[in-house]
Amino acid sequence: MKWLINAIDGLALILYRISGLLLILMMLSVVADVASRSLFALTQGSLDLTFVGGIELVKYGLLFAMLFAFPHTVDKGQIVVDLFTHNLAPSTLRWFDGFYTFCFGIFGALLCWRFTEAAEASRLSGELTQDLLLPLAPLYLVSAFALGMLALRGFSCGILELMGEKELMGKKDVTA
């Protein structure tokens, strides 16, 4: 069982690092788009290096950056309002944390299922993105994979927390 948890954690960490790379690529895309439009304006249209789909690249980059970050960070700091929890026993707090994380697993599983259905519907209809004319089915499948990882990590972390074995998760915890 420990190898499965380590495999899920390792894959979540890889997705987390890809998420950071996507944020950098989004930034570079925005800078390139603004620079090319400024150059176009400065040269009064004689030098056209603008490209179509910059906003769409950022839109899908942000989608994947967020979805890829979720699996690794699902157990990294839930906000707890001390006003309600400061008098609770540690075992009760552990139960709240575990239940909350497990519910994130359910949420990820439901979204994974919905994105998988959307991918199939998109594949059958041939739906494309608006600017770049990319097929949406593969984008939905990548989203479904990331949400499936969120579900697996939410379930595994939540169950370990409920069982009081959260230290199994933290043995090889690397944040970035």
Regions found by a protein language model. Give the residues of each.
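Alpha-helical transmembrane segments and membrane-interface helix-loop junctions
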Residues: 1-176
